[in-house]
């Protein structure tokens, strides 16, 4: 539907701006926008679902889900497997509503067997992953509060947008 409206808009502008000079300006503007979109898509690959998040003010990211599909969780799991290549099992707590089950299915069988998801049982976790997605008000509910015996060791920021953070047990 948006493509239809955009096409109609260009058609209308073309009728109104019949001179060749104005048409070249129109093609130039479209070309600039296409270059911008292509550039952003290359930067965000494979996280293209985050593309429109850059169009809003920085504080808007704190109010909405950023990585709803959990694509970044696959990156996190691969990083942890490389970091803890000799450890079995690697116990991961999740401090967000986003489940890691879909991301685990993407891993190969050998890596899948190394990972154990312990959910919010943080006392059993080696690492805690948070994607800042919550079904509860985090200001009044401590369900996803990171315990004090965990220290932030990594965060994934893409074009200024904080996607996830990783905490490791310090004891």
Question: Which role fits each region the language model picked out?
Answer:
Residues 39, 91-96, 129-131:
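Short beta-strand segments
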Residues 111-119, 123-171:
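Aromatic/acidic, Gly/Pro-rich catalytic loop(s) in extracytoplasmic/lumenal soluble domains
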Residues 1-5:
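Membrane-embedded alpha-helical segments of multi-pass membrane proteins
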Residues 53-68:
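Short extracytoplasmic/periplasmic juxtamembrane "stem" segments immediately C-terminal to an N-terminal membrane anchor
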Residues 66-107:
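Short periplasmic/luminal acceptor-recognition loop of GT-C membrane glycosyltransferases, typified by
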Residues 10-52:
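Signature aromatic-anchored transmembrane alpha helix within multi-pass, membrane-resident enzymes
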Residues 24-27, 89-91, 116:
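Ser/Thr- (and often Asn-) enriched beta-sheet segments in non-cytosolic proteins
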Residues 7, 106, 140-141:
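Short, solvent-exposed loop/turn and secondary-structure capping segments
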């Amino acid at each position: 539907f948006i493509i239809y409206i955009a096409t109609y808009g260009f058609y209308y502008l073309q009728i109104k701006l019949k001179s060749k000079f104005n048409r070249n300006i129109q093609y130039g503007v479209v070309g600039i926008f296409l270059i911008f979109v292509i550039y952003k898509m290359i930067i965000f690959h494979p996280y293209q679902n985050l593309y429109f998040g850059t169009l809003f003010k920085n504080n808007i990211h704190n109010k909405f889900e950023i990585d709803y599909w959990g694509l970044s969780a696959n990156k996190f799991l691969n990083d942890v497997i490389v970091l803890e290549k000799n450890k079995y099992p690697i116990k991961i707590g999740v401090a967000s509503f986003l489940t890691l089950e879909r991301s685990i299915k993407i891993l190969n069988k050998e890596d899948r067997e190394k990972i154990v998801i312990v959910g919010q049982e943080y006392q059993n976790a080696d690492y805690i992953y948070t994607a800042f997605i919550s079904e509860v008000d985090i200001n009044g509910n401590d369900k996803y509060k990171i315990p004090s015996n965990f220290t932030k060791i990594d965060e994934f920021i893409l074009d200024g947008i904080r996607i996830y953070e990783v905490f490791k047990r310090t004891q």
